[in-house]
Amino acid sequence: MMRDSLGPFRTFTLLTVGLLLSLFVIKTVKHRRRYHGLPTPPHNMLLGNLGVVLAEILASPEGFFHLFCVENIRRKYNMPSVFYLDLWPILPSIMVVAEPVVAKHMTQVQPLQRERFSPNLFSPLLTAEFILAMEQKNWKKENPALNAALTSTRVNEATSLLFPSLHSLRSRLHSISQSGKQYPIKDLLISYIIEVGGVIQLGGSFDLLAETSALDPIIKQSLDMMGWNPVKRYICSKEIKQRTDCLNRVLVATVQNTVQTGESGMMSQSPIYLAHVEQLASGRMDHAESIAYLVNTMKVIILASVVTAGAASYCYLFLHKYPDCLREMREEHDRVFSPDRTQTWELLQKEPHRINSLHFTLAVVKETLRLIGVGGVFKKLKTEEFLETEGNVYPVVCNVAFICHLAMGRRADLFPDPDAFRPHRFLPGANPPIPADSFRPFEKGQLSCPGQTLALKSLVLLLLTTSREFDLVPVFPKGAPRAAEYLGGEGYPEFHIGPHVNKGMPVMVHTRVDA
């Protein structure tokens, strides 16, 4: 009797499961057919492009920055400048854009909303409300005091304020050199870039470069917990919150102290203080809200500094691999400033605008950014439409576009000999010139990075004050994992907010005899 009573239920269950499977198959077939005739890697009705992407990820070395697999796929299957990755139902399907005119259309002509793949990526370091505010079209316009701190003029004016931090960096490099030991340079570079941002915005130093710094480990511990892995974030959620709360308390105290110092008139008014005054005067925020907002702003500067530090590590890696470029850059430093280190520091203090004449050094930085691509930008799309630009029509069959900076920077028709480190292509008057909208490491349009001038200046200043005094020689373990040579070989990029040389870029630091 029991068996008979279960019969109808079993039949209903089987019919339901069969119906759901049939609906899933119908939906899958309908979805896969959207990509028929479109440029994609090997595509099948069962997996779409999931198999291709998974194979690339599994073939990558440990810690590899998986967004760069997109460029591997483009090369391997000879994809055009706009192609599609059908990743449904595991991941959102993506329209990969490596075409400048299409990228311009999406970001400047008809700007689309930025896609937030993981709203919790920087949580709880940044609140969801603050991230949403940052993504608004008028965010930069509503923060003129903060943006004023990111201009070339402000950076030049504040150069002398950076001297204590720069001397601390030199002292640390000397200590590492004298120790004769390998050292992962990533952490030191992160500290330097954060210091620059802190000095520019706060008017004072975080003192991160001192070996006894109390704040440096607090920041590093918070940053180490950032990442895409949801399992790790869940398992470590309590530890992540503890570290973030600790950093938050320190930054709240720092911002409050900066505001109080500005109110007292004890020192020149910093951009953070001016932003606070502006927000109170406009009525947009009360005192507590303004402090919280400015603390979140400092956290954004810290996160952006990590990405910039990754570019710094690759500058040293490429200059080591291309000694002729290193020699030419050092000669420019001698010519624009002085072969004498002491005179260089004096000129830097008296005439900081000379930094603007370091054209080849800036070209080294830009060529580095072209080669590593930084990452890319995700944009939301409306499906079942067409994107038309300059006579070309691109079907929109997925919800997300990925503007892939790396793929754009590695196109031979845009950048001749694209895998070679050739800073001369970025010199004024270079022939051929850089094609319009093809070099966009900080993106363009309303959502472009407001700190790009500060990032470029901080990297040029770093190379000026270290490259003639020290040789940083990458030292990877024998038999270390390697990626494709065009991605740095054993110095392949790993993910840490942005691309960094893997393993923290272990180096031997040598003090140059003729420095």
UniProtKB/Swiss-Prot annotation:
Cytochrome P450 monooxygenase; part of the gene cluster that mediates the biosynthesis of the indole diterpenes penitrems. The geranylgeranyl diphosphate (GGPP) synthase ptmG catalyzes the first step in penitrem biosynthesis via conversion of farnesyl pyrophosphate and isopentyl pyrophosphate into geranylgeranyl pyrophosphate (GGPP). Condensation of indole-3-glycerol phosphate with GGPP by the prenyl transferase ptmC then forms 3-geranylgeranylindole (3-GGI). The chain crosses the membrane at residues 6-26, 50-70, 82-102, 300-320. One of its GO terms (cellular component) is membrane. Keywords: Heme, Iron, Membrane, Metal-binding, Monooxygenase, Oxidoreductase, Transmembrane, Transmembrane helix. Belongs to the cytochrome P450 family. It comes from Penicillium ochrochloron. It is a multi-pass membrane protein. GO terms for biological process: mycotoxin biosynthetic process. This is Cytochrome P450 monooxygenase ptmJ. Its EC number is 1.-.-.-. It holds the Pfam family p450. It is found in: Membrane. InterPro entries: Cyt_P450 (IPR001128), Cyt_P450_E_grp-I (IPR002401), Cyt_P450_sf (IPR036396), Cytochrome_P450_monoxygenase (IPR050121). Its cofactor is heme. Pathway: Secondary metabolite biosynthesis. It is an enzyme of class 1 (oxidoreductase). It comes from the Eukaryota. GO terms for molecular function: heme binding; iron ion binding; monooxygenase activity; oxidoreductase activity, acting on paired donors, with incorporation or reduction of molecular oxygen. The gene is ptmJ. Heme binds at C449.
